[in-house]
Amino acid sequence: MQLTELIETTVTGLGYELVDLERTGRGMLCIYIDQPAGISLEDCEKVTRQLQHVLTVENIDYERLEVSSPGLDRPLKKLADFERFAGSEVSVTLKKPLDGRKTYRGILHAPNGETIGLEFEGKKGEAAMLDFTLADIDKARLIPQVDFRSRK
């Protein structure tokens, strides 16, 4: 079983989603998990303990294991991510430029089959629509929406 498959099986078995996995040159393994209700420190501890056990049993070499939430600027990688975050503001970087640009920022529309829509501000300030597929994307991330106004 490949490392990604092993980790994804473990994480999903605990009721979480594997968002991303990074392996650094210094032996550090970074795992990013999520669930609809968000991720707590206890969730990270639970996944860390289980992964330490699984990686030891499977004899996977690593120096350090880090499990965390994907953060406010969560990457979008799967079609399910684009469905879940429809209506959110996102930044999408395409592999190949379209109309002379690769990076777009706008409001995500729910996928229609394999096609994903992004409503963005066009050259003349009018609303424009970009249609793309997962294969067209280099990277896509949520744009954090933080409200610093205090509640009264």
From Swiss-Prot:
It holds the Pfam family DUF150_C. Gene3D superfamilies: Ribosome maturation factor RimP, C-terminal domain (2.30.30.180), RimP-like superfamily, N-terminal (3.30.300.70). The keyword tRNA processing does not apply. Coiled coil: none annotated. Keywords: Cytoplasm, Ribosome biogenesis. GO terms for biological process: ribosomal small subunit assembly; translation. InterPro entries: Ribosome_maturation_RimP, RimP_C, RimP_C_sf, RimP_N, RimP_N_sf. It is found in: Cytoplasm. Belongs to the RimP family. Required for maturation of 30S ribosomal subunits. This is Ribosome maturation factor RimP. It comes from Burkholderia lata (strain ATCC 17760 / DSM 23089 / LMG 22485 / NCIMB 9086 / R18194 / 383).
